[in-house]
């Protein structure tokens, strides 16, 4: 090989070496991943590191008590954005357009009949009215007016009740059912059948998914038929010739109001609204002071993302039908007015607990209207005791109520307990008291509390109640507490004998120891049509209860309450005898609630309760000869 050829080969080798080096230099380096993920993604964590079991300050652990419900033990794997493919340009849209968000199911081919309560239905407020095919065909001008967001909601309820009970019942003074009935007390067995149909109709404007409605118009008529059978004449009607059976019916109006949304005060839809008409009002969490459906004007709203709620209102009592207890819109309203203001604060004084402050003024001016007799002929106002003169009164109530969890209670020893409590003082004046025969200053108090704790599927309840009583009816001071219109959810509520039944004070006037669906020993003629009475014996209640959700369809309820008067001087004066002992007795009750479809459409309730008399009740009713008073009921609720 010549020298020239060798030099050419050397130059070619050098050129190839430089080309390879240049190619190697142009290869991109491997990608490097940042130590910290982009903003918004979870940071890298050690999946094998156990989570801490100690809660952070103020943290609420979402864990049911007991075993078998442990929280996460390890952290889930972090999200890795490099394992998720991004969207590609020009990809077809997977969601087809629909007319509006209410018609999504119809756009996909689903059609539900109008009578189906379990799926989308125009009668349940699921769909706007204007686009209903029937309405657009037959009433197009109405459909046009209802654009774009008027809804209609219909609720129909059938409430059937059969009740068997035994109450103290007097022998009629004119004539008796059985010969030789010369005692004061007769046979007390009673049977009651009640059928109530309730139709609630509401027209609502607005998108209520995330904000309050702009307008709401609601009307709730109720139709009731009731039949009662007793063992003594004159127990059902004032005329003993009308016998021991009574059938009655009534059409009432339970709600009829207009609700107007006035304004939003924040971007979280805190609002102010006003409601005018016959409307439900509950003054506190448990209905101790006022739980009624009167005529009224209510201004209400929320603040601080629903952490603050308030109500300011004026209410006037509707006259009630005697035998049904429903509102009677066909008669004049009563001269009984209530001015109410309350304020709710969530997470006060600690997280998970809601506090409420309340002020109410009850003004009754029915003393100048003369005597009022109910539909059965018995006098209601004034009460048939003392000099039976009419009376007016003005009483103010100041109260505090609270309800919630005690998990964040200082000290931590109540972290599994719940508390519901109410405290009231009543201050006022009545111009005349029928028993004392003179004016009285009202100075009374009330307190109630219920502690509860959940043990998996069971809840234990401990209840205590105090109602001040009057020690001297003639000292110009009325110190027995009474409410405006109570309907308490407490100590078993309407499964308890003492709360459910009205026990008449026989031989002491046409009054009752306690009102039907009331816990206070108030000595009223009735809760629905009588006046408040602040000269009463007061009450102390101590109780224990248990709620057991055995299955989603089945709940068992049990209650055991001890009852005692605070002072029986008033009872001694009314009965013209030595004041009886203060012990009322033991109220024992049990109930079963069965929901076959695990919802409220079909609910069957049954309960049994008995009042085992104490020394005081035996002295009032001679209970040694007759055994305990009892109540057994069967109730079927059907809801559409």
Model segments located where?
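Bacterial N-terminal signal peptides
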Residues: 10-20
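N-terminal periplasmic/intermembrane-space "pro-region" immediately following the signal or transit peptide
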Residues: 25-214, 220, 456, 460, ...
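Short loop/turn motifs that connect adjacent beta-strands in outer-membrane beta-barrel proteins
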Residues: 123-154, 165-169, 204-217, 262-272, ...
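C-terminal structural cap/anchor segments
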Residues: 464-467, 471-583
